Regions:
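Short alpha-helix capping/helix-loop boundary micro-motifs
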Residues: 100-101, 156-161
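Append "with occasional cross-activation on large, charged helical scaffolds in nucleic-acid assemblies
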Residues: 1-130, 136-151, 169, 174-177, ...
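Divalent-cation-assisted or electrostatically stabilized phosphate/pyrophosphate-binding catalytic cores
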Residues: 162-167
């Protein structure tokens, strides 16, 4: 339930290999099952429809050698095509979410919020708010010190002040700008606030 727990869950999910449809029996890691297929009901995706058809055909005794050969011929291409379509759909969903979050935060420019540092790089850090909006604090916009990215400890450290911005750290920010075209939100930390 903590902000750190949510962050760790998201980072673990991001680090996992992206799922794809395949004709190979690979089991299910999370369920520790050697044999696995998935489908949703009601049917939401073409692979769900395809596996429903195959299971129904098998239950009714229609899965003959000829039909199995047919599926062995067409399903590898179906798996590749549907995996690529799903990646495109996921990307469209992410872009739509970003656009709506930018549009929402446009009304909150100048306001202050408390969030958690969700990502760090050599050019800044990301802060995620409790409402899942994520914005960037750019190092170029930070006054009073020069911050260096410590990749080993996943933190930014001020050369002069030794002030640190660490992954999972709670920070108070102010919304300074949004860009609808780039779908970005810029934050600045509010001074003298550090819960760690």
């Amino acid at each position: 339930g903590s902000s750190e727990e949510a962050l760790l869950a998201r980072l673990a999910l991001r680090s996992m290999k992206q799922a794809k449809y395949t004709t190979e029996c690979m089991g299910h890691f999370g369920l520790a099952a050697n044999y696995y297929t998935h489908f949703t009901s009601p049917i939401r995706r073409y692979p769900d429809l395809q596996i429903h058809r195959i299971i129904k055909e098998n239950l009714h005794g229609g899965l003959t050698k000829k039909r199995i050969a047919h599926y062995e011929k067409i399903l590898p291409e179906v798996a590749i095509w549907t995996s690529s379509r799903e990646r495109l759909a996921d990307e469209a969903e992410r872009e739509t979410d970003k656009a709506k979050k930018v549009q929402f935060m446009e009304r909150h420019i100048g306001e202050e919020f408390t969030g958690v540092i969700s990502g760090i790089s050599n050019y800044g850090f990301y802060v995620e708010l409790p409402n899942t909006v994520e914005g960037m604090v750019r190092l170029a916009n930070l006054d009073g010190d020069y911050y260096v990215f410590d990749e080993e400890h996943y933190e930014l450290v001020g050369e002069r002040t030794r002030k640190k911005f660490k992954l999972g750290q709670t920070v108070k920010i102010q919304v300074v700008s949004v860009d609808r075209y780039l779908k970005t939100i810029d934050f600045l930390p509010v001074r003298n606030f550090d819960k760690r």
